[in-house]
């Protein structure tokens, strides 16, 4: 991979400075899906400075399990980017590449929508993030051609906050013990 000649010196500086780079898994990038993410980590010898910005919106339209990605790359999730995607029913005309149709056009096979209005399994995702011990930043990347941005951004923040609950202090079945 040509990009490795450029990437290794950058990662050397990041290693020296204690910086962790969160690469967004996105078409057109070196790691754009599950297997290209595996191959990229292998190609850079799993250097700790290189991890992922978990953005499930791009995984959804590529048919990648976003929760499985969290579990499989648990030590490489360096940033969480909450953006949602709504998949439209397959109709034999709309593909995953968008067909150069405008955002929000019902002929598209999918669209970005305000967080909580699409098909990303948010609760399962946040439970998986909790299970892997993720304590890093969480951002909301808001894109929705069919909703006012101020309304949508505020609503998205509230939705994500509703998923950030505290863990129980004891297992639920402890209430049934005889002690």
Predicted regions, residues:
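Active-site acidic/histidine proton-transfer and metal-coordination neighborhood
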Residues: 1-52, 174, 178
